[in-house]
Amino acid sequence: MKNKIRGEFILKFLIVGDVCGRQGRETFRKYVPELKKEHNIDVVVVNGENIAGGRGISRKTLDEIYRAGADIVTSGNHIWDQKEIVSFIDDEPFLIRPANYPEGAPGKGYCIYPFKAKNIGVINVSGRTFMPPMDCPFQKVDEILKEIKNQCDIILVDIHAEATSEKIAMGFYLDGKVTCVVGTHTHVQTADNRILPKGTAYISDLGMVGPYNSSLGINVNNAIDKFITCRPVRFEMAEGPNIFSAVVLELAEDNSVKSFERILFNEE
């Protein structure tokens, strides 16, 4: 990453967990403008892989969260669930999918977002433990860092993974190499936000934005039926009070992490 840029400058990020369905989008739209004002947020990063009915990203839902304040949208294993994604993902510079899909996948696994005098790199990878088969996320991040580290002042990584152990391993693997590593996918915010020994901010999972009384956003009765019958069940999004999960990352003038705090709003 680049060296310190002269002049006083503190950069604040709002990094938001998986937004689930219509209620998630409405909750995102409700809280993000308020938080941007309250915390003087400069850049909003959000995982959007569940914004279209809980599965995937549509053109309409992507535009909606951009209008609500998202600057960069990451994703995960549900990125392809809406067929229309392939018609526009290559035209969206700040919508990224896991970089460790095999060569030839539409879209990109990282982006560089310019903000004032800074270039912000964001990398998205998927874990492999209890997840669909993918290329190695550790090797893929190394490959991307070689390509972009000299272009970027700040680098954020979203590891979309099931296993906390894999996310923690990625955090320590990248400690001192990137600014921040956040986990997504499990939809439950973890209480382990910290600054690692070499200065990288880390949290195992950001949590989700969407229905609170649910099984990861899904109607709990659907989930119970699935577990009891071991047969396919049509999942529907839950309704009721919502939860909003995110972190605020504050960087000092030299791009080091000044603070890394969780945000959790429960409307129940």
Located regions from the model:
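Acidic, metal/ion-coordinating pockets
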Residues: 2-268
